[in-house]
Amino acid sequence: MKFKFFILISLFFSLHTQATLSINDSHSKLNFYPESNEINANSENILTIEISMDKGWHTYWINPGDSGDPAEFEWELPEGFQMSGPIWPSPDKIPFPPLMTYGFDDQVILPFILKTPKIIPKQFELSLIHI
């Protein structure tokens, strides 16, 4: 499965954990969850992306095996911010005889680590392109 998203996420200094962002595609849904209720300066914060797919659809692991393309994540961040990840869980085997691929059916949860600089604005934006 290959799809593109352009997502603009506005995060505030006091970001509430109950506030999530959801994006729907034709066969998948992305939910974004912050780790805690605040994004602090000079810290590491976990931003989790949950990808849910329709029955019969899947997405590939970082090493997709015999066929498919791995998910790639490109972030546009404010100056001084750094994003690493995702931290990949172990994949499922997805057989396409005679080929074997690796990925995720139904759902995958991918944590990213957002490192903030010593001084951050009260409001900032992150842009994610998921290919």
Locations of regions flagged by a protein language model:
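Extracellular/lumen-exposed scaffold segments
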Residues: 18-129
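Sec-dependent N-terminal signal peptides
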Residues: 4-14
